[in-house]
Amino acid sequence: MMKVLFIADPMASFKTYKDTTYAMMREMAKRGWRLFHTLSGELSVNGGLVTAQASAFEFLGAKNDDDHAWFKSADKVQTALEAFDAVIMRTDPPFDMQYLYATQLLTLAEQQGAKVFNSGQAMRDFNEKLAILNFSRFIAPTLVTTRSADVRTFLKEHGDIIIKPLDGMGGMGIFRLTEKDPNIGSILETLMQLDSRTIMAQRYIPEIVHGDKRILIIGGEVVPYALARIPQNGETRGNLAAGGRGVAQELGGRDREIAETLAPELKRRGILLAGLDVIGSNLTEVNVTSPTGFQEIMKQKGFDVAAMFADAVAAWSVR
């Protein structure tokens, strides 16, 4: 019987009707696996050993239920991470210093024999915005800088751009700028904090009106359906957290080419689960911290993404 520890946000905060971590847990519980939960802030090192204040939990019913308690937890027990068959890091960004420290502890735990997914090293190496620079043939014209003057030059060259912080999530802090925007100066000052914060700028991709696509890669294999996240009217962000609407669709063409090119490289780097974001024919992000979209694809297309993930965890935990 597998013992799996989830490092995740408080379980009482889960929106069970759409939460991907919840879907993972449900599938593993169906298989009879023993499940445990901890917070990233409950990791510690004692006597050189990486441990967590972990609590075993079980489901109280067979259905998603946001209105009532859906789980029952036992008391927390300080447990070495190496005692679990798999440790799954599912804490949401931002990737701040606390997140960085957690990944460093996870790397130490891996050296002690723990099986961590995604690995601490992979999460540090793959900034979700900067990672696309490793795959330049799939991306739109892109600038990374701390200098607002560089952004102004880039804007003049392309006329219509998107700027975003490197540590955001859910569409937070993303702005669209055109040359005629009267607020260019104030937006750059706010986002770049007077040239002290590194940001990414990209040429605006007009296909965003049809949605950006979340493509999932699990254990080096491509999920055959993408989740198109379509912006609300008047929005430039398709993120579900920003009010976008998720529509599952079959993967094909350029989207499949991008996914199948990245899949073996992500596997080589120890990334069990990744979510690629694609707008039009352009790769815009590689999400490795806490990719979502499982439940939307499962409900709309009947493809069991959670089962595919659990299969991969079982296989990778004995590698």
Curated annotation (Swiss-Prot):
Keywords: ATP-binding, Glutathione biosynthesis, Ligase, Magnesium, Manganese, Metal-binding, Nucleotide-binding. SUPFAM superfamilies: Glutathione synthetase ATP-binding domain-like, PreATP-grasp domain. PANTHER family: GLUTATHIONE SYNTHETASE (PTHR21621:SF4), RIBOSOMAL PROTEIN S6 MODIFICATION PROTEIN (PTHR21621). It catalyses: gamma-L-glutamyl-L-cysteine + glycine + ATP = glutathione + ADP + phosphate + H(+). GO terms for cellular component: cytoplasm. Pfam families: GSH-S_ATP, GSH-S_N. One of its GO terms (molecular function) is glutathione synthase activity. InterPro entries: ATP-grasp (IPR011761), ATP_grasp_subdomain_1 (IPR013815), Glut_synth_pro (IPR006284), GSHS_ATP-bd (IPR004218), GSHS_N (IPR004215), PreATP-grasp_dom_sf (IPR016185). Signal peptide: none annotated. Its cofactor is Mg(2+); Mn(2+). It is an enzyme of class 6 (ligase). The lineage of its organism: Bacteria, Pseudomonadati, Pseudomonadota, Betaproteobacteria, Neisseriales. Residues 129-314 form the ATP-grasp domain. PROSITE patterns: ATP_GRASP. This is Glutathione synthetase. It comes from the Bacteria. Belongs to the prokaryotic GSH synthase family. The gene is gshB. Its EC number is 6.3.2.3. Mg(2+) binds at residues 285, 287.
